[in-house]
């Protein structure tokens, strides 16, 4: 038996012992069903800490934000989940607009940064910010040197012909990260020029992944030269020693407010509220760094990991969460991307 197989089997045994569901599944039984949209390690660590603190048994499903939004919508007549934790804020806002979530005022609101509370206010109390992350990209410095690429600093640098079939990004239909990219480019450049950029970028794309964080791993392994993700996803692999340069694009960039939502029709609502309140505490928000996740936490008393991107050095656009978090605008932009970009020949 290989070491990799042994480790995998051991991990599965630990999951079973902890009462967690395997990735992408949810157990039928349980005192709480959590839909999770951060990396698997962070999801597991949160569940284990909550179970230890409360004694409440948790069944967890991990999927990308676009997938979970679609799942919650599909299950709305017979909800299976109780709380949706993590993932880009736009799909959470869309769920709120469509009446898929519940109003809730947590006693922890007073401890949160204004941007987290604004998310709650904008959603009419149906979702709240739990962390923030800056959009950007990363590139494998060894591969860049082999291709004799200049230092990459801007969005425009990803259009270099030397990067043909060497850039990876998620599909915005399934990934909140990639939808944030689409909305960012449209706001930064204007819609016509923004879609022109996406068409030119398409020529260099080798794969549209399902998960927004997947390109970071691909860059770390040398499977692609560059990947567009949230910057903290790249930092995770930089900390592990991967030859990655993280880029905050010179033209400016968008950002996410990772959010949390109580699902309308939750079968375990009181336990879901306990998770919601606990997930906003400094104690819970410190778990991200322990799981090698480097987002900026929403609780003012929680310390941002020292490895987290320095927001003071990043040029941010004035991201319009109200407009681009609406269901109508999301559907319109995705339909346009599908029609004008996704199936273009390379």
What are these regions (language model features)?
Residues 133, 197-202, 208-209, 240-264, ...:
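Periplasmic-binding protein-like
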Residues 320-346:
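Conserved C-terminal helix/tail region of periplasmic/extracytoplasmic solute-binding proteins
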Residues 138-143, 183, 257-268, 287-288:
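A bilobed periplasmic-binding-protein/Venus flytrap-type ligand-binding module shared by bacterial periplasmic
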Residues 37, 41-44, 80-223:
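Extracytoplasmic ligand-binding site segments that recognize negatively charged/polar headgroups
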Residues 90-94, 220, 225-243:
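A ligand-binding cleft/hinge motif common to bilobed small-molecule-binding domains
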Residues 29-94:
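Early extracytoplasmic/lumenal segment of secretory-pathway proteins
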């Amino acid at each position: 038996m290989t070491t990799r197989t042994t480790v995998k089997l051991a991990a599965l045994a630990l999951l079973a012992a902890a009462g967690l569901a395997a990735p992408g599944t949810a157990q039928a039984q349980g005192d709480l069903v959590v839909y999770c949209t951060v990396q698997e390690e962070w999801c597991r660590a949160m569940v284990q800490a909550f179970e230890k603190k409360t004694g409440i048994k948790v069944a967890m499903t991990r999927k990308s934000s676009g997938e979970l939004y679609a799942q919650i919508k599909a299950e709305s007549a017979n909800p299976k989940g109780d709380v949706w934790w993590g993932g880009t804020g736009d799909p959470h806002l869309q769920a709120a607009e469509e009446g898929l979530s519940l109003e809730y005022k947590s006693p922890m609101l007073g401890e949160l940064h204004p941007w987290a509370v604004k998310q709650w206010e904008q959603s009419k109390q149906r979702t709240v910010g739990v962390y923030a992350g800056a959009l950007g990209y990363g590139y494998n410095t060894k591969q860049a040197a082999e291709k004799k690429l200049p230092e990459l600093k801007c969005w425009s640098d990803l259009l270099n012909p030397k990067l043909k079939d060497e850039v990876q990004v998620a599909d915005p239909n399934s990934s909140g990260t990639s939808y944030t990219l689409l909305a960012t480019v449209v706001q930064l450049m204007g819609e016509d020029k923004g879609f022109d950029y996406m068409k030119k970028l398409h020529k260099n794309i080798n794969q549209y992944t399902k998960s927004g964080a997947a390109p970071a791993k691909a860059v770390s392994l040398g499977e692609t030269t560059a990947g567009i993700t949230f910057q903290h996803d790249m930092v995770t692999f930089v900390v592990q020693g991967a030859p990655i340069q993280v880029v905050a694009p010179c033209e400016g960039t968008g950002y996410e407010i990772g959010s949390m939502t109580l699902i309308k029709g939750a079968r375990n609502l009181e336990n879901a509220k306990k998770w919601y309140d606990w997930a906003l505490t400094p104690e819970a928000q410190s778990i991200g760094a322990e799981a090698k996740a480097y987002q900026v936490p929403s609780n003012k008393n929680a310390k941002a990991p020292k490895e987290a991107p320095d927001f003071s050095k990043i040029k941010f656009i004035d991201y319009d969460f109200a407009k681009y978090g609406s269901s109508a605008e999301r559907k319109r932009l995705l339909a346009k991307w599908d029609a004008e970009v996704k199936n273009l020949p390379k």
